[in-house]
Amino acid sequence: MSYTIPAQTRTEIGKGSSRRLRREGKVPAVIYGVGKEPVSIVFDHKDIINIQANDDFYTSVLTIVLDGKEVNVRAQAMQRHVFKPMIDHVDFVYA
């Protein structure tokens, strides 16, 4: 199954800006890989919370629509809130 996640490039980086994004219902993330510059992104929490419950989310290639351009990635790591059903941060790797 293929998954598509709309995202935007993130310009503000750091703990304070990430906390502000989480309060707004967004998830900060990063895309990195060999030979490419890392890209900080942000997407809506509602766009990922349901699809990450599927097992194939972690093994299949995902499509992130980043500012109108499609980028193929794989989920590398996901940080979750300790007791709330929320995702704090996601690391993606270029596929």
Curated annotation (Swiss-Prot):
One GO biological process term is: translation
Cellular component, GO, one term = cytosolic large ribosomal subunit
Give a GO molecular function annotation for the protein. Answer: structural constituent of ribosome
For this protein, the record's CDD domains field holds:
Ribosomal_L25_TL5_CTC
**InterPro entries documented for this protein:** Rbsml_bL25/Gln-tRNA_synth_N, Ribosomal_bL25/Gln-tRNA_synth, Ribosomal_bL25_long, Ribosomal_bL25_short, Ribosomal_L25_dom, Ribosomal_uL5_bac-type
Judging by the UniProt lineage, the source's domain of life is Bacteria
Q: Which UniProt keywords apply?
A: Ribonucleoprotein, Ribosomal protein, RNA-binding, rRNA-binding
Can you list the disulfide-bonded cysteine pairs? Answer: none
Q: Does the keyword Zinc-finger apply?
A: no
SUPFAM superfamilies with a match to the protein in the record: Ribosomal protein L25-like (SSF50715)
Q: Of which family is this protein a member?
A: Belongs to the bacterial ribosomal protein bL25 family.
Supply the NCBIfam families for this chain: bL25_bact_ctc (TIGR00731), PRK05943.1 (NF004612)
Query: Per its database record, what is this protein's job?
Result: This is one of the proteins that binds to the 5S RNA in the ribosome where it forms part of the central protuberance.
Subunit and partners: Part of the 50S ribosomal subunit; part of the 5S rRNA/L5/L18/L25 subcomplex. Contacts the 5S rRNA. Binds to the 5S rRNA independently of L5 and L18.
Q: Kindly provide the name given to this protein in its UniProt entry.
A: Large ribosomal subunit protein bL25
Source organism per entry reads: Shewanella amazonensis (strain ATCC BAA-1098 / SB2B)
Q: What is the lineage of its organism?
A: Bacteria, Pseudomonadati, Pseudomonadota, Gammaproteobacteria, Alteromonadales
Q: Which gene encodes it?
A: rplY
